Amino acid sequence: MASKESKPSRTTRRGMEPPLRETWNQVLQELVKRQQQEEEEQQGLVSGLQASKADQIYTGNSGDRSTGGIGGKTKKKRGWYKWLRKLRAREKNIPSQFYPDMESNMVGMENLTLETQLEDNALYNPATYIGDMAMDGREWMEWRESAQKEKRKGGLSGQRTNAYPGK
């Protein structure tokens, strides 16, 4: 305990010295000037009713689309302006190959053709199926039933019967 009390609680260095009188006077003068300027500005505001710059009636170009008043996000960054600008930028950036001139040759575009087996398939020929639209219901049910029966053989259905031995 005695050793702790002998040491000062806080050491001071040269950098921590209080400011000289001259510099302190300068600080005070700047403070007074700043306060006077603020008072003059407040009196100079429209009709003298507003207390600060942020409350001004006329804030320069706030009616313009680009700004939303003092300290706010620009309107360009808000909502649908942002979306619209992105959309326009996208349209400008679409390369010309995506707007091909239909009368000229489309360079780089290959003719897409179906394989011959697919072309011969009746599904791809709409004329063959126009009169024969409805499939026979019994045929469909038989096909469906066989698929259902196959499913019933395995899976959870066997487990369910063993889960409740009393029933």
Swiss-Prot record:
UniProt region (Disordered), positions on chain: 1-75, 144-167
Statement: the UniProt record of this protein carries the keyword tRNA processing: no
GO CC annotation terms, alphabetical: host cell cytoplasm; host cell nucleolus
Subcellular location: Host nucleus, Host nucleolus; Host cytoplasm
Compositional bias annotation for Polar residues: 158-167
Intervals of motif Nuclear export signal: 106-115
Main location: host cell
Keywords: Coiled coil, Host cytoplasm, Host nucleus, mRNA transport, RNA-binding, Transport
UniProt biased composition (Basic and acidic residues): 1-20
Record remark on domains: The RNA-binding motif binds to the RRE present in incompletely spliced viral pre-mRNAs. This region also contains the NLS which mediates nuclear localization. These overlapping functions prevent Rev bound to RRE from undesirable return to the nucleus. When Rev binds the RRE, the NLS becomes masked while the NES remains accessible.
Subunit structure: Homomultimer; when bound to the RRE. Multimeric assembly is essential for activity.
Function: Escorts unspliced or incompletely spliced viral pre-mRNAs (late transcripts) out of the nucleus of infected cells. These pre-mRNAs carry a recognition sequence called Rev responsive element (RRE) located in the env gene, that is not present in fully spliced viral mRNAs (early transcripts). This function is essential since most viral proteins are translated from unspliced or partially spliced pre-mRNAs which cannot exit the nucleus by the pathway used by fully processed cellular mRNAs.
Protein's name in the database: Protein Rev
Source species taxonomy: Viruses, Riboviria, Pararnavirae, Artverviricota, Revtraviricetes
Gene: rev
